[in-house]
């Protein structure tokens, strides 16, 4: 829907799912992750966090806010062993994707399990990257900071 036409309850639901639930999860799991000498946290984002795609307002805004939340958490853990990163899985064969792109051939997209396989290496003790965005399709981390 156009941004001005989104119902308040729909907007609130998107914010609750993508931001508040992650914040609550952070509050719950952080003590456990900090007890580990190799705590790792990955938070799923979306490419729409970086684009102003028409009719995606609440979702895009929530994913952009989510990425900032994750970067703040990573900065707060800078002096700990905990590594925190966001993940942009790229187009993935999900029910949400099918609803958003009904004419798209799902066979052209990876299944969630295939995406998850690529994330395993981000959870290993030897990972030393934190506060970045991992783009699954490009198989690389990108930095958020713009060149000065």
PLM feature spans:
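C-terminal helical subdomain
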Residues: 86-87, 94, 102-145
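Short beta-loop-alpha junction of Rossmann-like oxidoreductase domains
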Residues: 1, 82, 88-100
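A short helix-coil junction within the Rossmann-fold of NAD(P)-dependent oxidoreductases
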Residues: 1, 28-37
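Substrate-binding pocket helix/loop in short-chain dehydrogenase/reductase
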Residues: 1-3, 7-12
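A short, exposed helix-loop element centered on a Lys and neighboring polar residues
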Residues: 26-27, 71
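Catalytic loop of short-chain dehydrogenase/reductase
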Residues: 8, 34, 40-65, 70-79, ...
